[in-house]
Amino acid sequence: MTSHRLPEITLTPELTAAAAEAKAWPFEEARKILKRYAKTGLPETVIFETGYGPSGLPHIGTFGEVARTSMVRHAFRILTQDKVKTRLICFSDDLDGMRKVPDNVPDRAALEPYLQMPLSSVPNPFGGDYKSFAKHNNAMLCRFLDTFGFDYEFASATEYYRSGRFDTVLLKAVERYDDIMKVMLPTLGEERQATYSPFLPISPKSGRVLYVPMKKVDAKAGTITFDDEDGEETTLSVTGGKVKLQWKPDFGMRWAALGVDFEMFGKDHQTNAGIYDRICEILGGRAPEHFVYELFLDQLGQKISKSKGNGISIDEWLAYAPTESLALYNFQKPKTAKKLYFDVIPKTVDEYFTYLSAYARQEWKDRLNNPVWHIHYGNPPKADLPVTFALMLNLVSASNAESPAVLWGFISRHVPGVTPENNPELDALVGYAIRYFNDFVKPTKKFRAPDDVERAALEALDAKLGELPAGTDGNVIQNAILDVARAIERYQDHTKKSPEGGPGVSVSFFQMLYEVLIGQERGPRFGSFVALYGIDETRALIKKALAGELA
């Protein structure tokens, strides 16, 4: 088990009062637990649980469960004024059989002989000190949870089954075998009904997890009898890790054995939630409170799968953005299916810093609805980001900067007094921006030559910028750009009005600027970009475009 220190809580009357009214989803979920114990009073310890299937490396969805559950746990601590102990158990189903060889492992053929073996008995294909596939993947999960400083207890199904921690409930499952079958059989097709058993023996001969019908279930002896793979009739005790449960009964058994009060799971489990609950109750437990979240999708709109390795990995996100941005993406709209791919990173980074800058100015009731309060467990840091991530990406694109020093040259001129030393958050973003640009923006950059109308517009813009002194504010530059566009019929938008009452400016004008000057379809406010990049530098860029040196 791995355990870390819980974040400290400073309770104030303002915080307590705001929490009682807070509408953010972690508070709504925490109130379910209060309601659960409204009649009996709260227990000494409330148990939160998340599950992990180590058939593949942990992905962001796996991390998201722990992050979101931790947010609910923190909200619960505030609502109870931290008078009730809490535990978060991260449970790995590492006794499950390997149903197929994952796509994203080295030397797949070497794992073929281990199909249907418990994941904790499959050799580790990645090298290093971990003895099994599951031990490696469990370590990868813990490593990442540790980098975030989560307070959690890691639990292994293999250890819990083999150490006897589930024995009492497993013996109860033998006693109540018929009741469990009454829940399970109606959920199965006719063919499966004939052979289904909630018990999966682990063959004493081959070590494989067996999906075989039961010949006898002996409640008194606590044993099951079945035919092993070679046809020999075999009797095993259900205790000591010789037998495990099918995954649906296993879910409910775990809740009963551990006394779980709250567990969230993906929408793919929603139809089975009633089954898990019923099994838990049959085995003498009380079903926990649930929270069902929508699944993350890859760039093609497909469900992200650990074994396929599609979508984006934890390490990949963290190569291009700070960890807090990942926590924000998990906090936002958990009941909405969202695409989880590289192109969501810049927007999420900028949203995080926008929320962070707003926090200090907010009343308590608004603070508790601000994602950064939940991400940082009520103690968000102070950070001032004078340049957005999106703007920095455009700066890298226009300047072809390969080193942080070049970018800092532009930033220091634009925001005097800001240095890498006194703004480490911004310095980190500079590194992220260069890496993100090189890996995702640069390969897709595509400049196009301007047509005659666009050439005239660019010439007019060049002349207009020439009238502005160096160091002109971004808003003034933006207005000057709009003045140029308003005079050109193609870019007049008659559904909008200019300050003078004439037509407004179509977004197609700014799209043209980005396509011709930056080689991208869109970008942040162009006036802000010019202020950061420099008026003279932007004019030089326009001249290059007009001379055909970009496209």
Curated annotation (Swiss-Prot):
Pfam families: tRNA-synt_1f (PF01921). It is found in: Cytoplasm. One of its GO terms (biological process) is lysyl-tRNA aminoacylation. Its main location: cytoplasm. Keywords: Aminoacyl-tRNA synthetase, ATP-binding, Cytoplasm, Ligase, Nucleotide-binding, Protein biosynthesis. A motif ('HIGH' region) lies at residues 54-62. ATP binds at K306. A motif ('KMSKS' region) lies at residues 303-307. GO terms for molecular function: ATP binding; lysine-tRNA ligase activity; tRNA binding. GO terms for cellular component: cytoplasm. Its EC number is 6.1.1.6. It catalyses: tRNA(Lys) + L-lysine + ATP = L-lysyl-tRNA(Lys) + AMP + diphosphate. Belongs to the class-I aminoacyl-tRNA synthetase family. This is Lysine--tRNA ligase. The gene is lysS.
